[in-house]
Amino acid sequence: VDIKEETEWVVDIECMGRHFKVQNKFSFLCDYNKMLNVTADRAYQEISAPAKREFRKYVNRLIMDGKFTTEYRYKSTGWKKINGKWRYVTDIGVIGEPTLPYKSETDHKFEFAPNLVDDLNTFMDFFNMRKLSEEKMRNTVFLMHYSCLSVMTTLFQELGHGINFVVALIGTTNSQKTATATVFTRLYNRTTKANADIRFDSTEAAILEKTSSYGDSILMIDDLLPYADSTLAKQQNGILREIIRNYGDRLPRMRSKLFSKINNVERYSPVRGCCLITGEVLNLEEESTVTRVIQLDFERGDINLRRLSYYQDNLLSLPTFMYSYISFITENIENIFYIIQDEFANVRNREYPSNMPRRFVDTIAIMSAEIRIFYTYAESKGFLSSVGAQQYKKEDQEFIEYIIMKNFNEAQLENPTAKILASLKWAIEKEKISVYYSPEEKCLEGIKSEDIDNMVTMTDDLLCIRP
């Protein structure tokens, strides 16, 4: 078993009708006493020095004769370049090429239905997830494509187009936001109706550790809460900002030497996948943070509960579809790279508002590339006709751009007087300040932003707003 530069040996021992298995380093393999301990003292122990020498000779002879199989293991799932070719590795092996001796050594397990791979019903099961919310189909279409995008994280990164945003699913209590997010994102550990991968009440260190193991998949972080306690709120917001910046910048996080040594992990922890956050609130202030998040809003009643129950009961629908999708990407990797580069060139040549941050433009390019790849897959497999694929592609592109432009419009920096007015409006609604109305006060509804500069004047003591 090769784990980067470390080599471990897995030894199977048959002794007195019982089977024992041990994995350790070579020095352990040649240690006569330790190997005997593996058998719970059932093996006959010959204590003479010649016997021990013969044992070591026997082990060395097995190795020299090559009477073993070699297996290579990675500490994360996802795309690895193996023998010059990109391949997607999971704990059960390489997707699409199960005979290759490569696996990931992770706690999260990949399970799927082999007999349903490339099946029309499997595709339609996934495709119809877009209908989980007919009230806000834009949101569920975005989640569907974000789920597909996540399994290509490394490929986008390889081309210099890192997926530099996270998705936040924000909704009121009982809006089914967590359940909805789970059916779209839970690629691993699908044997039960599992909870989120991790929650915001976990430590920052625990959350950030997850970011490096979920390669080319989505890490779901649940339960962003509106704390009344200012200390808890500040702590949670600090963790939130760190998560958003990590995924937005995709810079490796450095661990301490001591932590790395104790836990046998690398000092540098790269962000390998995508992230979806769920919660009731999302209070972001800095522009640099706001532009790294695409927010999807859900309310109670937006999700079709009957359809949601179907996907909660059919746990293997998502990973079985993804097995087929990833296999297609593996077989057509050069075309996938071409589509990504081509979409970036096309999108960056379009006209967008002059004050629109490049992050939002690149987000459109990233999602556009995924949409094109998805419908290329659907058409090539015969799941959709050429006409049908083009119609859905156009519809999904409009949905995606609407959401991104909506996030841009809500995030753009306003002029100072507009920000003052927005702050005053919030303070009045929350009854944090009282309002004095002058006799000539008029209704402020419907004021245009371009008129704001002519409405506000300041003296040493007062802020005067003229209707």
Which stretches of residues belong to each language-model region?
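Structural recognition of the conserved hydrophobic beta-strand(s) that form the central parallel beta-sheet
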Residues: M220, S256, R272-E280, Q295-L296
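DNA transaction DNA-binding modules
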Residues: I82-N121, M129-R130, Y227, I339-P467
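Conserved AAA+/SF3 P-loop NTPase catalytic/coupling segment centered on the Walker-B
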Residues: L219-Y247, L282-T291
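P-loop NTPase catalytic core of nucleic-acid-dependent motor ATPases
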Residues: G96-A194, I364
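Conserved catalytic/switch belt of AAA+ P-loop NTPases
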Residues: Q236-V265
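Conserved glycine-centered beta->alpha loop in an early N-terminal alpha/beta scaffold
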Residues: V1-R138, E209-K210, G215, S288-T291
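Phosphate-sensing "switch" segment of ASCE/P-loop ATPases
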Residues: S269-V271, E286-S385
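AAA+/P-loop NTPase substrate/partner-engagement loops
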Residues: T180-A233
